């Protein structure tokens, strides 16, 4: 029996796939538990519509990420920190502090986990911080740390 998978089933198929499975398995397990639907014209057209909607949403998400990238690359986040001799900071500037400053000053909310900073910023001056906005879009945010 041909079925359209509505959910991922380990070892059998992923959501949206059309596969041929045993009749008993399809009727008694997959369809009964809502993991799959019989592959008739209605189910296939519904699947096609769902794929188009997902593609449209993905394109909109990508465009939104591109626009945010353009905006972020023009900004500079200004932070103040206490420092000692030679421009070394007491402690470091973390991604949380950068995200909070970006939210407070520019009104742009970005999750701190999207920023890639290995050890934090430990010196005064400008630092470029990569921000992963989408799996295809990465922006570079300028962070300027000045002495308090």
Swiss-Prot record:
<dbReference type="InterPro" id="IPR009027">
    <property type="entry name" value="Ribosomal_bL9/RNase_H1_N"/>
</dbReference>
<dbReference type="InterPro" id="IPR000244">
    <property type="entry name" value="Ribosomal_bL9"/>
</dbReference>
<dbReference type="GO" id="GO:1990904">
    <property type="term" value="C:ribonucleoprotein complex"/>
</dbReference>
<protein>
    <recommendedName>
        <fullName>Large ribosomal subunit protein bL9</fullName>
    </recommendedName>
</protein>
<keyword id="KW-0687">Ribonucleoprotein</keyword>
<dbReference type="GO" id="GO:0005840">
    <property type="term" value="C:ribosome"/>
</dbReference>
<dbReference type="InterPro" id="IPR020594">
    <property type="entry name" value="Ribosomal_bL9_bac/chp"/>
</dbReference>
<comment type="function">
    <text>Binds to the 23S rRNA.</text>
</comment>
<dbReference type="GO" id="GO:0003735">
    <property type="term" value="F:structural constituent of ribosome"/>
</dbReference>
<keyword id="KW-0694">RNA-binding</keyword>
<keyword id="KW-0689">Ribosomal protein</keyword>
<comment type="similarity">
    <text>Belongs to the bacterial ribosomal protein bL9 family.</text>
</comment>
<keyword id="KW-0699">rRNA-binding</keyword>
<dbReference type="InterPro" id="IPR036935">
    <property type="entry name" value="Ribosomal_bL9_N_sf"/>
</dbReference>
<dbReference type="Pfam" id="PF01281">
    <property type="entry name" value="Ribosomal_L9_N"/>
</dbReference>
<dbReference type="GO" id="GO:0019843">
    <property type="term" value="F:rRNA binding"/>
</dbReference>
<dbReference type="InterPro" id="IPR020070">
    <property type="entry name" value="Ribosomal_bL9_N"/>
</dbReference>
<dbReference type="InterPro" id="IPR036791">
    <property type="entry name" value="Ribosomal_bL9_C_sf"/>
</dbReference>
<dbReference type="GO" id="GO:0006412">
    <property type="term" value="P:translation"/>
</dbReference>
<dbReference type="Pfam" id="PF03948">
    <property type="entry name" value="Ribosomal_L9_C"/>
</dbReference>
<dbReference type="InterPro" id="IPR020069">
    <property type="entry name" value="Ribosomal_bL9_C"/>
</dbReference>
């Amino acid at each position: 029996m041909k079925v359209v998978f509505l959910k991922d089933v380990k070892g059998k198929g992923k959501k949206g796939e059309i596969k041929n499975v045993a009749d008993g398995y399809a009727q008694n397990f997959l369809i009964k538990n809502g993991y799959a639907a019989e592959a008739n014209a209605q189910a296939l057209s519904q699947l096609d519509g769902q794929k188009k909607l997902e593609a449209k949403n993905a394109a909109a998400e990508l465009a939104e990420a591109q626009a945010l990238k353009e905006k972020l690359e023009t900004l500079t986040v200004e932070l103040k920190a206490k420092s000692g001799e030679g421009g070394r900071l007491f402690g470091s500037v973390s991604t949380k502090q950068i995200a909070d400053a970006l939210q407070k000053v520019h009104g742009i909310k970005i999750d701190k986990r999207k920023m890639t900073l290995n050890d934090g910023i430990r010196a005064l001056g400008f630092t470029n911080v990569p921000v992963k906005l989408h799996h295809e879009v990465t922006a570079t945010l300028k962070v300027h740390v000045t002495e308090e």
